[in-house]
Amino acid sequence: MGMRMMFTVFLLVVLATTVVSIPSDRASDGRNAAVNERQTWLVPSTITTCCGYDPGTMCPTCMCDNTCKPKPKKSGRRND
């Protein structure tokens, strides 16, 4: 197969994929089906802290009342 023939086949493949993808975009009416069909429980309706939920399961209770002890810094050049 010559270079001219390979280039022609390449152009045909590109043209065919473009023609196939245009009608599918029109059929979707410009909407993203994956977003529209997402379960409502996967999308949070409000932004809350971890303590806005059940503190025992979502985060340590010390984070809710600011009683967590700070972690000691490790020695090193950046922490001096």
Swiss-Prot record:
Expressed by the venom duct. Residues 22-38, 76-80 form a propeptide. The keyword Disulfide bond applies. Residues 1-21 form the signal peptide. The modification Pyrrolidone carboxylic acid is found at Q39. It holds the Pfam family Toxin_8. Keywords: Amidation, Disulfide bond, Glycoprotein, Hydroxylation, Ion channel impairing toxin, Neurotoxin, Pyrrolidone carboxylic acid, Secreted, Signal, Toxin, Voltage-gated sodium channel impairing toxin. One of its GO terms (molecular function) is acetylcholine receptor inhibitor activity. It comes from the Eukaryota. It is found in: Secreted. The modification 4-hydroxyproline is found at P55, P60, P70, P72. The keyword Lyase does not apply. Its main location: secreted. The modification Serine amide is found at S75. Contains 3 disulfide bonds. GO terms for cellular component: extracellular region. Glycans are attached at S45. InterPro entries: Conotoxin_a-typ. Belongs to the conotoxin A superfamily. The cysteine framework is IV (CC-C-C-C-C). Neurotoxin with probable activity on sodium channel. Induces intense repetitive firing of the frog neuromuscular junction, leading to a tetanic contracture in muscle fiber (spastic paralysis). In vivo, shows the same effect as the whole venom when injected on fish prey. This is Conotoxin SmIVA. It comes from Conus stercusmuscarum (Fly-specked cone). The lineage of its organism: Eukaryota, Metazoa, Spiralia, Lophotrochozoa, Mollusca.
